[in-house]
C-alpha cells in the first residue's frame, strides 16, 4: 500500500482510496482505566496491528474512559472489522500485560460492545476531527500522535 501524505490518498494494486474513519468506543462500564500504562500498551499494540492488518492508525486519542481513532484501511476492510480487530487484540494485550485491570471489570471484556464510526472527508472536517482527537490529552501525556 502506497500513501500520498499530501492528499491522504492510498493506492493498492487494483484500487485507489481516500477513506478515513473516526471511531470512538468506551471502556466497559465507562470505567476510568486508560491510565498511562494502559495507553502505552494500546499504542504499542496499535503499531503491531498497523503492520499485521494494513490499517493506518493516523491518530489515537485516549481519555480516561474512552478512545478515539482516526484511521484508514483498504475498502475491502469494513469499519466494523477494524473495530473488532482493534478491540480484541488490544484487550488481550491489556489483560496479559496489566493483569490488575481484570479486577476492575467483570465478565472478561475490556471494551463495550458498541462503538461510533463516521467518515472523515479530506475537505472540511479532517483537520477539525484530527485536532479534536489530539486534544483528548490536553494536560495529560498524549496517547499517540502521528502526522
Please annotate each region the language model reported:
Residues 1-144:
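Basic nucleic-acid-binding interfaces
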